Each structure stands twice: as structure tokens, then as C-alpha cells.
Regions:
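Conserved C-terminal structural/oligomerization subdomain of aldehyde/semialdehyde dehydrogenase
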Residues: 9-18, 199, 335, 342-470
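Structural signal for hydrophobic packing residues in well-ordered secondary-structure cores
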Residues: 35, 39, 54-61, 65, ...
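Residue-level signal for inorganic ion chemistry
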Residues: 13, 46, 68, 90, ...
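ALDH superfamily catalytic-core signature
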Residues: 174, 210-352, 414, 462-463, ...
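N-terminal Rossmann-like NAD(P)+-binding subdomain of aldehyde/semialdehyde dehydrogenases
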Residues: 1-113
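Short, well-ordered beta-strand elements within core beta-sheets of diverse protein domains
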Residues: 16-19, 33-40, 126, 236-239, ...
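Rossmann-like NAD(P) dinucleotide-binding subdomain of oxidoreductase/dehydrogenase enzymes
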Residues: 104-246, 371
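A short hydrophobic/small-residue beta-strand
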Residues: 150-152, 329, 411
Length: 470
């Protein structure tokens, strides 16, 4: 019997989907055979095909959102916003392609001309995460296909049904099946795809642990493009603000949206000493009002479960680890059912903890640090190997100027949540958060390589120095 991959609903434990495990060699070979024909198509044809893809997703939005909600456990309202992002990615990518990789002509001497054009890499592997199993891999796939590449997509083994649905939408829209391939499988399939000699590069969104392993694996393969979008141990700093309730709302949105399963979620709250007591009390009160429930519950939940029981187990272990290191509980991490991965929002003070761990606890856990001056706040915010997102809540513009100049992160926000990033801008981080290949609007940059050509319609040449007389 062929090996199968099963997907279960986090909120119920029920079996949702099953499929045989795919063959990496077959999928890469198919993409290798088909990509040249796709690349040879005019860019206008590829744009029109991808716009049909957006329309296909729009037409299937209800079924798609329902599937995402059931497979990830996120609330249905949030799954619907993910569908909106999938649809919007096409027009955003078309604009980015035109702006960043369009043909350009440069002035040249002696009647020649210089042109800058771009070529696709060939076959690109895409490894997707489970937290946004449609939107995030789609953010690699749309610009890759637009540039003329073929794609071999392996969704997370935790959300394979969503990945399969996404690929079905591409095929239904007219993207050639040989140019949009799907690999169903677990970590072994992902490793085999990453190491396959038939790919020309890999585009990844996921954990720092996996990203670092990929970075090592590609270290002696400079001929292959590698774009890494990893996690963050993101700080949110609250300083000099009279509106404590609004600050608390922004902190809760930053830390607990998507049950904390966003790479840009706030993991650390750094708060001015004078604001500590009222702010922490306001956050604690608001966190206690958040509805944690299943995707289709009524009233609608603010957040659902984390992705599965092993993830919940790991978060509980991580919270206990903070306690044993000297953390002080503000709000306990509560698991309402030991057989399901529902967790309540949790807060823990780590101000007096020596050797605070620099780890991304990918769930609804917020660590709180009391700072006595703004320099200490920035120093604490930068006390991480990651560098994805950071936010300052303050009514003082001069403080934001200092914060922006001093913080090391790829997304730096002011009076906005850490997990807010515009789609028409680059998205990425430094340190363990990425390898300086930002995605979103700048994904066009890693999906094609520039070619510079000096051109003249007639050959003209002369050597004026260094020749003996004839």
C-alpha cells in the first residue's frame, strides 16, 4: 500500500484529508520539461493567466476559506482575509514586476545601446508554512510564475489540503500542469526537494531552524537562488503614551492574533517603568475577554487553537521553562482540553530573569520586561539574533526617530501592531529572520536575474593604441 499523508482538524481532531505521498523526482522532472514553454510565452499572456487564477480563487472563496479554517484552526473570518490576500497578490506582483524587472534602455556612446532585461531562473521549489498555508506560499509562487519560472510546491505536512486546493486553482485558471507541480509529503520530501539537482533555487517561508539548515545546504551551491523568510523574537515597546487602553489593544493584536502563530507576532513587551502597572493590567483584562474557540463558533472567536497537539505541548514546555528560569506569571497559559491544542493567551514577566532565552515561542505567550530608560528599552529590544519586526507605541515623534535609528529589524512600526505590513512594500528581516532577500513587493527580485546587454545594429571596431605600423 502506498504511503499516505493525513491531515486532521486542530479544533476537533477529526480526519480532514488524506493523499498518497508524492514523488519528488517525478514532479521536478515534469517541471523541468515544461518550464521553457511557459517562459517563452509573452509576459502579457502570463499576466492574463494569473489574473484568471485570481478570479478562480475569488469564485471558490467560500470553500477555500472553509478549508483553511478547518485545517489550521483559525477563525473563519481570518481565513477569509487570507483568501483576500491570495487574490490581491496577483495585481501587486504585476505592479512589482513592471517596476523592478521591466526592460530598461540606458544611454551608451558611439550609437550603441545598453539594455537591462531579466530572465527566469528555471525551476523553483517553494516550501510553504502552516500558519498562512495559502497566502505565504502564494507570495512566492505568483511572482515566480509571472517571471516565467516553473514551480514545484511542497506545502507544510500540517496543511497539505490547503496546498492541494491552491494548486487546483492554478490549474483551473490555465497555468500549465507541468509548470505548477505539487509534492505531498513530510520533512523527508522537503529535504529531497531542497537537495534535488533539478531545481534552480528554493523559496522558503518557515522556522529559523529549517531556514538555517537550508542555508547550510545551499552554501556550496552559489548557482542556485535561495530566499529565506524566517521567524522573529519581535519586541513591542510602549513609552510615553497617555492612552493606555489603545496601547493595550495594539499589544494584544500584536501578540495574540492568529493564536500568536505569525512570524511578526510580538513575543516581547518592553514597557516604561511608569506605565508598567496600568498597561499590564489593561492587557491582562483585555486578554481575559478574548474568545478562544473553533473556526465556525458563534460568537466568532478572536483566535483558535494552535496547529496541533505537539505544538501545544511545546508551548506549554516553553512556558514552564520560563517559570523555572525565574519568570513571574501574570496570566497563565491554560489548555482547556488536554486532547486538543486550544491555549489561552499568556503573559509572564521576565524582567529579573538572568540569561533570558532568545527563542521564538510560536504561540500566544507574551514576555514582559520593565525598562527604566529608553536606551535600556532599545538595548533589550535588540537583544535577539532575530530581526524581523518591531513596534513602538508612543506619542513622542522624537522617540520614534531614536527607535527607528537604533532598532535592528526589517519591519519597524510606530503606533501600529508588529504584525502589520503593507503589501506594496518589501517584507523581510535581518539576522536569523532571513538572508537579505525580502519578499512581498521585492519578491520580483529573486524570481528573475538581470541581464545587461550592450547592443549595436552594425559592428564597428577600431584599435587606436598599441599597434605597429603595417
Amino acid at each position: 500500500m502506498a504511503e499516505e499523508l493525513l491531515s486532521h482538524e486542530p479544533a476537533t481532531g477529526a480526519l480532514l484529508w488524506r493523499s498518497p505521498v508524492g514523488d519528488v523526482d517525478e514532479e521536478v522532472a515534469a517541471a523541468r520539461a515544461g518550464w521553457a514553454g511557459w517562459a517563452a510565452r509573452p509576459v502579457a499572456f502570463r499576466i492574463e493567466t494569473l489574473r484568471r487564477f485570481a478570479n478562480t480563487v475569488r469564485a471558490r472563496a467560500d470553500a477555500f476559506a472553509d478549508l483553511i479554517a478547518r485545517e489550521t484552526g483559525k477563525p473563519l473570518w481570518e481565513a477569509k482575509t487570507e483568501i483576500d490576500s491570495v487574490v490581491a497578490k496577483v495585481d501587486i506582483s504585476v505592479s512589482a514586476y513592471a517596476e523592478r524587472t521591466a526592460q530598461r534602455r540606458l544611454d551608451s556612446p558611439m550609437g550603441a545601446r545598453t539594455s537591462v532585461r531579466h530572465k527566469p531562473h528555471g525551476v523553483l521549489a517553494v516550501l510553504g508554512p502552516y500558519n498562512f498555508p495559502a497566502h505565504l506560499p502564494n507570495g512566492h509562487t505568483v511572482p515566480a510564475l509571472l517571471a516565467g519560472n516553473a514551480v514545484v510546491f511542497k506545502p507544510s505536512e500540517k496543511t497539505p489540503a490547503t496546498g492541494a486546493f491552491l494548486v487546483e486553482c492554478y490549474h483551473a485558471a490555465g497555468v500549465p500542469a507541468e509548470c505548477m507541480r505539487l509534492v505531498i509529503g513530510g520533512p523527508a520530501a522537503g529535504k529531497a526537494l531542497a537537495e534535488h539537482p533539478g531545481i534552480d533555487g528554493l523559496l522558503f517561508t518557515g522556522s529559523a531552524r529549517t531556514g538555517l539548515a537550508l542555508n547550510r545546504a545551499f552554501a556550496n551551491k552559489p548557482e542556485k537562488i535561495l530566499a529565506l523568510e524566517m521567524g522573529g523574537n519581535n519586541p513591542i515597546v510602549v513609552w510615553d503614551t497617555p492612552d493606555v487602553d489603545t496601547a493595550a489593544t495594539i499589544v494584544v493584536q500584536s501578540a495574540f492574533t492568529s493564536a500568536g502563530q505569525r512570524c511578526t507576532a510580538a513575543r516581547r513587551l518592553i514597557v516604561q517603568d511608569a506605565l508598567y502597572d496600568p498597561l499590564v493590567a489593561a492587557i491582562d483584562k483585555l486578554a481575559g475577554r478574548l474568545i478562544v474557540g473553533a473556526p465556525h463558533d458563534d460568537p466568532q472567536p478572536f483566535m483558535g487553537p494552535v496547529i496541533d497537539n505537539p505544538a501545544a505541548d511545546g508551548l506549554q514546555d516553553g512556558f514552564v521553562g520560563l517559570l523555572t528560569r525565574g519568570g513571574r506569571v501574570i496570566r497563565h497559559l491554560v489548555r482547556s482540553d488536554p486532547d486538543l491544542p486550544f491555549l489561552s493567551p499568556a503573559m509572564i514577566d521576565v524582567t529579573d530573569m538572568p540569561d533570558r532565552p532568545d527563542a521564538e515561542l510560536f504561540g500566544p505567550i507574551l514576555q514582559v520586561f520593565r525598562a527604566h530608560d529608553f536606551d535600556e528599552a532599545i538595548e533589550e529590544a535588540n537583544a535577539t539574533r532575530y530581526g524581523l519586526a518591531a513596534s513602538l507605541i508612543s506619542q513622542t515623534p522624537a522617540l520614534y526617530d531614536r527607535f527607528w535609528a537604533g532598532i535592528r529589524a526589517g519591519v519597524v512600526n510606530w503606533n501600529r501592531p508588529t504584525n502589520g505590513a503593507p503589501s506594496n512594500a518589501p517584507f523581510g528581516g535581518v539576522g536569523w529572520s532571513g538572508n537579505h532577500r525580502p519578499s512581498a513587493y521585492y519578491a520580483a527580485d529573486y524570481c528573475a536575474y538581470p541581464v545587461v546587454s550592450s547592443e549595436a545594429e552594425a559592428a564597428r571596431a577600431a584599435i587606436g593604441i598599441g599597434l605597429r605600423d603595417p
